[in-house]
Amino acid sequence: MWSRSYSITTKAVTKEQIWKLFADVNNWNTWDKGIEYAVLKGSFEKGNHFTLRPKGGPNVKVELLEVIENTRFLDVTKFLFAKMYDEHIFEETEDGLKITNIITVKGLLSFLWVKLVAKKIVDSLPLDVQEQIKAASKL
């Protein structure tokens, strides 16, 4: 198993604003420049799936495993002999909203998918989270 996390605390957004940003999957490409498109049919809730196409990559099916409004969500992407879990946690603190993103890869070929996909995601988290905060602050 391989896991990495990134956290930042900010007063620029509320948990409701950041939640609204993430729950609107079909508009992720407006603030995430690494995504060509994302399509969720149905609501942002446990058990639903969405399709995401990273720029320069193939379509990826993502399943929502846990969804707790304004607090956290966990999704999974299934690769050949591996799974990548992406957990987003939103915690109110006296210093502001703590935003945490945890990427975990498990499975027989996890080392391969870490190299091909997960490491790039983790390396871009600081900039990506700043873009999320910027976009959510306008909601």
Language-model-detected regions and their locations in the chain:
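Short, intrinsically disordered, mixed-charge
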Residues: 20-30, 69, 123, 127, ...
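Secreted/surface-exposed cysteine- and glycine-rich disulfide frameworks
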Residues: 47-52
